[in-house]
């Protein structure tokens, strides 16, 4: 249990460090950013497919955005402030394809984060995932763009 807390603390620290300054892409103002780290190799997880869905009024998931992580393990530009309205969103990270490309047979098909966004006004969300073949941890950093 203590090791899980330490792992989450380290992951949160990595997210805060990455938020401290702009990334190489200069897109630090995007309302939704995903960062994926490889816990086995101790490096950013590159070319990981990420799919974002928005929950519809009939409780189905509608595709919202998608992309792949960069050399820094980050994915920016998924949406704009105008499109990223209040609602329930699901971020799905394709862990299976990532590990298979490295010759590893993983347990999970994907890592999934479901969250309510912008219910307290516009916010910026960084969803971070720390991956290993048989587990994953996620955390989020939510900031007010006006602060």
Curated annotation (Swiss-Prot):
List the glycosylation sites. Answer: 118
Q: What is the effect of changing residue 79 to K?
A: In AMYLD1; amyloid cardiomyopathy
Q: What is the effect of changing residue 74 to K?
A: In AMYLD1; early-onset amyloid polyneuropathy
Effect of substituting residue 114 to A: In a patient with amyloidosis
Q: What, per the annotation, is the impact of changing residue 134 to H? A: In CTS1; amyloid deposit on carpal tunnel; patients show no other abnormalities
Could you tell me the keywords of this UniProt record? Amyloid, Amyloidosis, Cytoplasm, Disease variant, Gamma-carboxyglutamic acid, Glycoprotein, Hormone, Neuropathy, Phosphoprotein, Secreted, Signal, Sulfation, Thyroid hormone, Transport
Q: What is the effect of changing residue 136 to V?
A: Requires 2 nucleotide substitutions
Which residues does this entry mark as bearing Phosphoserine?
A: 72
Q: What is the effect of changing residue 75 to P?
A: In AMYLD1; amyloid polyneuropathy
Establish whether keyword tRNA processing is in the entry.
no
Q: What is the effect of changing residue 90 to N?
A: In AMYLD1; amyloid polyneuropathy
What else is noted?
Tetramer dissociation and partial unfolding leads to the formation of aggregates and amyloid fibrils. Small molecules that occupy at least one of the thyroid hormone binding sites stabilize the tetramer, and thereby stabilize the native state and protect against misfolding and the formation of amyloid fibrils.
Regarding protein family, the annotation reads: Belongs to the transthyretin family.
**Which illness does the annotation name?**
Amyloidosis, hereditary systemic 1: A form of hereditary systemic amyloidosis, a disorder characterized by amyloid deposition in multiple tissues resulting in a wide clinical spectrum. AMYLD1 is an autosomal dominant form due to transthyretin amyloid deposition. Protein fibrils can form in different tissues leading to amyloid polyneuropathies, amyloidotic cardiomyopathy, carpal tunnel syndrome, systemic senile amyloidosis. The disease includes leptomeningeal amyloidosis that is characterized by primary involvement of the central nervous system. Hyperthyroxinemia, dystransthyretinemic: A condition characterized by elevation of total and free thyroxine in healthy, euthyroid persons without detectable binding protein abnormalities.
What name goes with this protein? Transthyretin
Task: Identify the species of origin.
Answer: Homo sapiens
Gene name of this polypeptide: TTR
């Amino acid at each position: 249990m203590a090791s899980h807390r330490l792992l989450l603390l380290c992951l949160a620290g990595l997210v805060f460090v990455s938020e401290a300054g702009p990334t190489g892409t200069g897109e630090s103002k995007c309302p939704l950013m995903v960062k994926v780290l490889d816990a086995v190799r101790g490096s950013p997880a590159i070319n990981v497919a990420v799919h974002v869905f928005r929950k519809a009024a009939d409780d189905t998931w509608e595709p919202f955005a998608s992309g792949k992580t960069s050399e820094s393990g980050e994915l920016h530009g998924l949406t704009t402030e105008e499109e990223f309205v209040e609602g329930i969103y699901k971020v799905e990270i394709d862990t299976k394809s990532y590990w298979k490309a490295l010759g590893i047979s993983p347990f999970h098909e994907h890592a999934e984060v479901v969250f309510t966004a912008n219910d307290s006004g516009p916010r910026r969300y960084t969803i971070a995932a720390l991956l290993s073949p048989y587990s994953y941890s996620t955390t989020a950093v939510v900031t007010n763009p006006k602060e």
